[in-house]
């Protein structure tokens, strides 16, 4: 039977753009507490067949990256939703980790896709001029 009232396929979209973590005076980075409610809302839409996530991040805080990644996977499993990730200009380090929460990842051939990196700090003591 023909019907003009077809079921619409709904795919909520989440846009994550910026450095991961509380960055700068006005905390303009991407952090879990700032995204938690938005992510939860996207996955709670019952008619949604999937959740789309656009990521544009060079990385940043590994803790925030893991929190966001794990929360996306947890809600995807709980709500039985597919996650489709679109890497925009850059998805590197922690941005790439969040991308790995997707069941599918799409990127432009010009996008910068990086590895999940590591940052290490060291203390270096240099001799003073008198000791040289």
Write out the residue ranges for each language-model feature:
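A short, well-ordered alpha-helical element
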Residues: 25-49
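Glycine-rich beta-to-alpha active-site loop
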Residues: 59, 75-121
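Short, electropositive alpha-helical surface patch
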Residues: 65-75
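Short, glycine-/small-residue-enriched flexible loop/hinge segments at domain edges that mediate gating
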Residues: 46-62, 84-88
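Conserved small/polar residues in nucleotide/adenosyl-binding loops
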Residues: 122-128
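STAS-typified acidic loop motif
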Residues: 7-33
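Terminal peptide-recognition signature
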Residues: 14, 53, 99
């Amino acid at each position: 039977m023909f019907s003009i009232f077809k079921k619409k396929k709904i795919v909520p979209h989440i846009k994550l753009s910026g450095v991961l973590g509380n960055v700068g005076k006005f905390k303009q980075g991407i952090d879990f507490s700032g995204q938690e409610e938005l992510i939860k809302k996207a996955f709670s839409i019952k008619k949604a067949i999937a959740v789309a996530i656009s990521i544009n991040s060079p990385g940043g805080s590994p803790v925030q990256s893991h929190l966001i990644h794990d929360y996306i996977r947890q809600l995807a499993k709980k709500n039985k939703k597919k996650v489709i990730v679109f890497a925009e200009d850059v998805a590197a380090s922690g941005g790439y980790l969040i991308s790995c929460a997707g069941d599918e990842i799409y990127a432009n051939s010009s996008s910068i896709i990086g590895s999940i990196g590591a940052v290490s700090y060291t203390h270096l003591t240099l001799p003073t001029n008198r000791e040289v």
